[in-house]
């Protein structure tokens, strides 16, 4: 059992939660140190039994501290604090997915060298918890694929657009007002946050290094109400998915908007909730659902990791990197998928024949085609789904359509994922 104090970098989230308040009693923590920018500021939780300091290095260098909880976020200070703490022989618990996605390999290597624990359940969909499921619950399985909704902000936006027919910008403003999206929402709406998380899940699932830089990443900022209406008519829901999949010559790592059949359970996951589907050789397909962010979800995962250390559990999030297999990441152009395309074309005689002719020229079969009524500008809205084809081929089709005399707007392309 950990008998020495625990250092908490970043106080508000964990201390204000129910799980965080249980920390000192359930786990017999002797004391809790927290670095704060202003230790005289009024807090939303009781800090009377907590030793406060404005200098985080005072605590990571303190000889009587066993465990460091890093909850401040970012790359610079957080990385320096964690490196210092590890070198001083302290166990690490963090919720910092961006830091792990960009620097996790070197930090894990350092933790292994110093023989300390480096745990980060809260970094990905903290309320599920998916990392322990992959490492422990599915340890008898070979993981074939991981696919999920791992950013609650994006899921909230897409859900509201579908349910209320609102446009993207309008829902984004509401998400910011509700605190679901940051003032600068780039990480959430452009898929960067989800890509950080996917790179972590893939490394654990497949026993590789973290490869955030190789994740194909596309956000939801260009999804329109027209896309959602067409998808609904075709029997699909648009979800922003992170997908890691074993294929014959490597693994696919991709984050992008995806049409998912309404028959799939994951299509029913709405609002800020997260869900991850895992396909494995023994168990088959399993679904893990729960809140991915917020005070309680983060604190629940952080305190669970703390329990593991205090109770001397053998699980360690560094296990997935021991083999560090060299697995090729498939280039996005080579990935095969079914696709949805939305076109805006002039309503002239023979236009449908010209459109389908472009698909025929590329040897691509059309699975479904919907033409909506002509708008006030005498343009026709067309939605098409294809059979399985490479991304490179469908991008060539897009280029050919956009170069035609009848095209009136950029062609929208969205993956269709069967998740079978």
Predicted regions located by residue number:
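N-terminal glycine-/serine-/threonine-rich beta1-alpha1-beta2 phosphate-ribose binding loop
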Residues: 1-87
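Generic hydrophobic/aromatic pocket-lining and core-packing "Φ" positions
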Residues: 56, 82-86, 108, 228, ...
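Rossmann-fold NAD(P)-binding glycine/threonine-rich loop
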Residues: 72-88, 95-136
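A short hydrophobic/small-residue beta-strand
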Residues: 91-93, 366
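Rossmann-like NAD(P)H-binding beta-loop-alpha module
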Residues: 112-193, 200
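Substrate-binding/catalytic subdomain of NAD(P)-dependent oxidoreductase enzymes
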Residues: 170-268, 273-275
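ATP-dependent carboxylate/acyl-activation modules
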Residues: 264-334, 338
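A conserved regulatory-domain signal marking ACT and ACT-like small-molecule sensing domains
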Residues: 306-420
């Amino acid at each position: 059992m950990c008998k020495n104090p625990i250092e908490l970098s970043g106080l508000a989230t964990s201390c204000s939660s129910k799980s965080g308040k249980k920390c000192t009693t359930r786990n017999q923590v002797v004391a809790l140190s927290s670095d704060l920018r202003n230790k005289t500021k009024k807090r939303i939780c009781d800090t009377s039994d907590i030793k406060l300091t404005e200098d985080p290095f005072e605590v990571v260098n303190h000889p009587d501290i066993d465990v460091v909880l890093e909850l401040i976020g970012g790359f610079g200070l957080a990385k320096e604090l964690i490196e210092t703490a590890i070198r001083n022989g302290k166990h690490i618990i963090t919720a910092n997915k961006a830091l792990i996605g960009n620097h996790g390999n070197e930090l894990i290597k350092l933790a292994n060298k110093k023989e300390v624990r480096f745990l980060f359940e809260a970094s990905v969909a903290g309320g599920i918890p998916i990392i322990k499921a992959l490492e422990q619950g599915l340890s008898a399985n070979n993981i074939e694929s991981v696919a999920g909704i791992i950013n609650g902000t994006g899921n909230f936006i897409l859900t509201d657009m579908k349910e209320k027919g609102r446009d993207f910008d309008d829902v984004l403003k509401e998400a910011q007002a509700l605190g679901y999206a940051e003032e600068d929402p780039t990480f959430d709406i452009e898929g960067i946050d989800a890509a950080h998380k996917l790179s972590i899940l893939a490394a654990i699932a497949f026993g590789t290094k973290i490869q955030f830089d190789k994740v194909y990443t596309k956000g939801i900022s260009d999804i329109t109400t027209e896309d959602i209406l067409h998808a609904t008519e075709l029997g699909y829901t648009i979800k922003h998915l992170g997908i890691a999949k074993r294929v014959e010559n490597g693994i696919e790592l991709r984050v992008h908007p995806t049409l998912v059949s309404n028959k799939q359970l994951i299509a029913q996951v709405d609002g800020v909730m997260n869900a991850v589907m895992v396909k494995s050789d023994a168990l088959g397909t399993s679904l893990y659902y729960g809140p991915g962010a917020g005070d309680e979800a983060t604190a629940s995962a952080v305190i669970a990791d703390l329990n593991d250390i205090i109770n001397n559990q053998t699980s360690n999030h560094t296990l997935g990197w021991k083999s560090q297999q060299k697995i090729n990441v498939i280039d996005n152009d080579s990935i095969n998928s079914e696709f949805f395309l939305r076109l805006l074309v002039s309503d002239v005689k023979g236009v449908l024949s010209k459109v389908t002719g472009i698909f025929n020229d590329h040897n691509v079969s059309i699975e479904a085609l919907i033409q909506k009524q002509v708008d006030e500008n005498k343009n026709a809205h067309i939605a098409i789904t294809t059979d399985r084809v490479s991304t490179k081929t469908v991008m060539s089709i897009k280029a050919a359509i956009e170069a035609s005399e009848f095209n009136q707007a950029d062609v929208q392309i969205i993956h269709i994922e069967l998740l079978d």
